[in-house]
Amino acid sequence: MRKLRGGQTKETRKQRQERKEENLKIQQQMKTIVLPTIGVIFLCIVVYVFLKTRPRYEEL
């Protein structure tokens, strides 16, 4: 069994199960919140670079 931080007591089955559930919850949040946010930021950067580097044609 795993020792908890700062103490001599060991982790119980219930604590281990709760820890695993928390880890799964965090991974799910990663997929639903963090990755789409990074995607939007990346897309904004791509659009900004595209708009700043496109050739401009001056009308006569």
UniProtKB/Swiss-Prot annotation:
Residue span of region Disordered: 1-23
Q: Does the keyword Chaperone apply?
A: no
Q: Which residues form a coiled coil?
A: 8-33
Q: What segments bear the compositional bias annotation Basic and acidic residues? A: 8-23
What are the UniProt keywords, alphabetically?
A: Coiled coil, Membrane, Transmembrane, Transmembrane helix
What Pfam families is this protein classified in?
DUF4519
The compartments listed are: Membrane
User: Where are its TM segments located?
Assistant: 31-51
Q: Which GO terms describe its cellular component?
A: membrane
What topology in the membrane does the UniProt record assign?
Single-pass membrane protein
Q: Could you say which protein family the record assigns here?
A: Belongs to the SMCO4 family.
* UniProt name for this protein: Single-pass membrane and coiled-coil domain-containing protein 4 homolog
